[in-house]
Amino acid sequence: RQLYNPGGKEIMQKDSFNFADTKFGRFEHAYSTQDLSYLDVDTDGFFYALDVTLGRIYWYSADCSLLSVFGGNTGEGTQRGTFSRPVAIAVSESRVYICDGDNGSITSFAMTEYGGLVREAQKITLSGSYTQAKRAWEKIISLDANSQLGYKGLAKAYYDNGEYSRSMLYAKHGMD
């Protein structure tokens, strides 16, 4: 199935990875170009990309699946979890650290319970143990009914168990 935007461009392309947001962001009627300048990788191969223009942190699994986006840039970086001028990223265990060059501060982000569930489910799935990850994916869907990754994980679990019709249903929900 192909989906197109009003301009005629295909929006659901499966042959490429979508890193971060669109090329341009808009803030207070001004357009800015995205700039993924810094990366760090944790011990399990999950990686974090820092967009220094928009102040966002993009969290990916080892297979390049986007897991979460957090942080932001509000101009002065005075709101919790936002930055004025993010200049570095570091990952240590279950924490992500961002250095703000203008404010001279380091912000520490801790993994949430939901993030921990996504991380564990994705680790199990990437190891090929789809059925073992099923319970975690079900919990994720119960917390976020819009989790495409959760539906994809359940599709793999049902496929692994030979439940092909159910697998197809979950794959459709996951837009896979």
What are these model-derived regions, one by one?
Residues 6-35, 63-87, 123-124:
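Gly/Pro-rich loop segments of beta-rich domains
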